[in-house]
Amino acid sequence: MNYINFNIYFPSILVILSLYMTLKNLIFCFIILHNFFSAAQKKESRLNVIIDTDSANEIDDLFAITRAIQEPNFRLLGITAAQFHTSPYASNNTALESHEINKEFIGLIPNFKVPLILGSSLPLKNAKTPRISDASQFIIDQARILPKERKLYLIILGSCTNVASALLEAPEIKSKLVVLYVGFWHDTKKNTYDKKEFNTNNDIIATNFLLDSEGLDLRIMSATTSQDLVFNKSITFNNLGDNPLGNYLKQRWTEYERWWTKKDIEKKYWIMWDLAIIGALINPELTNIKQFKTPLDNLDRNILIYTAIDSKKMEDDFWKHYKTLINHIPHDPF
């Protein structure tokens, strides 16, 4: 019988095994690194977002904020509080009211942290003097620390005071900004504007300043377009469910009295003006957006205006996101 002398082949076997294990490890490392860099690249592609909101006015702001929370395509840098001094319910400091609401609302979401910053309680006095606040400084700071090729998306759900003030304080940040504003009425066929609208009236000087800012990337979700996004109360309350976040939104719907209209006294329906701009940024395929000339009383330049939204799909998208969100929120046992 012939025997194989393994002592002769053993070194070669070790070399082969070593090469095999090295190759295997290299492949494993490659997979790990590929997944890491893919995740990092995906994370880097998120939009850097600040929401500027008059959340103590109305209820639609809170639905808009809800849609933005933990949105995978957003890097939510902060929520700044805006003033709404023209409301008949206005206190001496409506920005502070909004700030307190923001703290209450975000506090309902366990393990979720986002900077909450107080903005100016007053509108601009003129188009040259900013209303310096923590919010305007926060906007400036966030714009400055972003890499040159990255944009800061400022979503204005109320008055334009904080954003306009930031630009007045630091005009060099203009090229870093994409400003999305919910405001004024717009006739898309005639390209005529009606600035007699709540958000616009709360700081008409600031609104005009943004319209007059040459080179500023300004995108408008007009009241004309956003009014198409309407939620039904019974459907909304059923979908909100019994949880801290849903109960807060239901209470807000029930208790807030709409001073601007005598229609639908029972509040069976609510226009989600502000949710429309969040939905549009997340799902641009659900919108039409076109380029228009600014109003005749403003600097002659081009801005972008949303002319239509798919309100049904936008609402469906909200509820899909909401259900995912509340799955991470413990139900109130009481």
Question: Where on the chain are the PLM-derived regions?
Answer:
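N-terminal acidic, glycine/proline-rich low-complexity segments
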Residues: 41-334
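Short linear sequence motifs
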Residues: 2-3, 13, 23, 27-30, ...
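Bacterial Sec-dependent N-terminal signal peptides
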Residues: 3-43
